[in-house]
């Protein structure tokens, strides 16, 4: 059999044509067409199931790709803006839609699978990234997790991590998708290779300093051969004021008390007059470990698999109106809806679409509609903001949220 592609990835055209859908949607379309019912006008909404691990909120991501998916398809789409906080239910326990689609069901039924795939994974990554950033506060957090995932996904994963609030991403393609510069330090392989069979970390640190342009921070990896404390001292003595930071990437089998190790390194650097040298940590980090290591004195974090392989958000799409009549399967509520949010309290109220604007149930203040026109008759009518703008929006919302609770 002749190979038609190098990697097992669907093309843009295949996704747009619905060739990545589940077979039962293709059969549904076939049945509808055979019975002349493919023009039935429906409203279908997207809601989430309970959020992973008791998370109290999520960050909606993947909406720009959603726009590309539905562009040219004769439907109307209302959606929360990309980067919006969403909840499983509103303040009264009503499931919260993040978008709805209105049009002939035969026109978009085969797009349900890619629709959900585009937002389920990206929203999970963005949400985990936001939780990690919330735990780190103002300290630097970088996404280091693409090596654990299929390389075709690196732009999406790094974009979602950046939108979620992380300060930088490691991949070249991911940085391009995020509109940011790639960030990173140095691998153990560089230190081993530069040693040419000798234990000579200093040679690698100095070579990096000599070759890299001035704008690249000098962050020395300090756990290749010796104790992290010893190598940190060696690195500072080798590069002096040119050294921006040291990175501790200790294998899990040797971490022991990682916070205590951070405290030791910080002490040894400070007493030698190297208070300017930052401590970067990486390896198996999540929001709780970031919080603990931050308290111990870590200045920056490289977060990998916990973000790139974050739990997906369990979004589902359900028909809620059929030819103007309210319908719904068991466990769902019929009728088109609007989500009203108090920007001060971040409290939501879900009401039938067209209902009068409610007041915030907590503070009595004004609320704002979250589901806004996104696509009209197949044309994108909403602004598609740049990733840096979406990230700014996410960080603004995070100021009013906690990662605790359920």
Residue ranges, per PLM feature:
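Ordered alpha/beta subdomains of enzyme catalytic regions
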Residues: 1-216, 242, 316-406
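Glycine-rich phosphate/ribose-binding loops and adjacent secondary-structure elements
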Residues: 189-354
């Amino acid at each position: 059999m002749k190979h038609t592609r190098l990697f097992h990835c669907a093309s843009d055209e295949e996704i747009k044509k619905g060739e990545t859908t589940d077979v039962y949607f293709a059969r549904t379309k076939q049945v509808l067409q055979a019975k002349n019912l493919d023009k039935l006008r429906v409203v279908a909404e997207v809601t989430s199931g309970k959020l992973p691990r008791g998370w109290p909120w999520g960050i909606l991501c993947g909406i720009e790709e959603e726009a590309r998916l539905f562009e040219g398809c004769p439907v109307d789409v209302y959606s929360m803006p990309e980067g919006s906080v969403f909840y499983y239910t509103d303040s009264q326990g009503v499931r919260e839609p993040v978008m709805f689609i209105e049009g002939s069901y035969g026109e978009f039924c085969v797009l349900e699978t890619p629709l959900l795939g585009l937002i389920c994974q990206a929203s999970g990554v963005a949400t985990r990234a936001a939780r990690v950033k919330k735990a780190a506060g103002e300290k630097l957090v970088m996404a280091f997790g693409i090596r654990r995932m299929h390389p075709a996904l690196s732009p999406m994963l790094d974009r979602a991590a950046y939108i979620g609030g992380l300060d930088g991403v490691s991949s070249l393609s991911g940085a391009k998708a995020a509109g940011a510069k790639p960030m990173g330090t140095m691998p153990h392989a560089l230190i081993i290779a530069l040693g040419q069979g000798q234990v000579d970390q200093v040679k690698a640190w100095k070579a990096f300093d000599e070759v890299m342009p001035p704008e690249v921070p000098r962050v020395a990896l300090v756990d290749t051969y010796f104790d992290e404390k010893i190598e940190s001292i060696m690195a500072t003595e080798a590069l002096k004021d040119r050294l921006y930071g040291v990175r501790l990437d200790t294998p899990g089998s040797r971490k022991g008390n990682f916070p205590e190790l951070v405290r030791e390194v910080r002490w040894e650097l400070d007493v030698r007059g190297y208070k300017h040298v930052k401590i970067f940590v990486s390896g198996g980090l999540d929001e709780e470990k970031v919080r603990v290591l931050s308290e111990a004195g870590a200045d920056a974090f490289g977060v990998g698999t916990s973000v790139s392989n974050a739990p997906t958000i369990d979004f589902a799409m359900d028909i809620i109106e059929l030819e103007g009549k309210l319908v719904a399967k068991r466990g769902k509520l019929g009728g088109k809806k609007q989500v009203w949010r108090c920007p001060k309290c971040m409290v939501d109220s879900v009401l039938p679409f067209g209902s009068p604007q409610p007041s915030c149930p907590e503070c009595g203040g004004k609320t704002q509609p979250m589901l806004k026109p996104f696509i009209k008759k197949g044309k994108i009518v909403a602004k598609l903001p740049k990733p840096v703008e979406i990230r700014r929006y996410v960080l603004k919302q995070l100021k009013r949220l906690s990662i605790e609770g359920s």
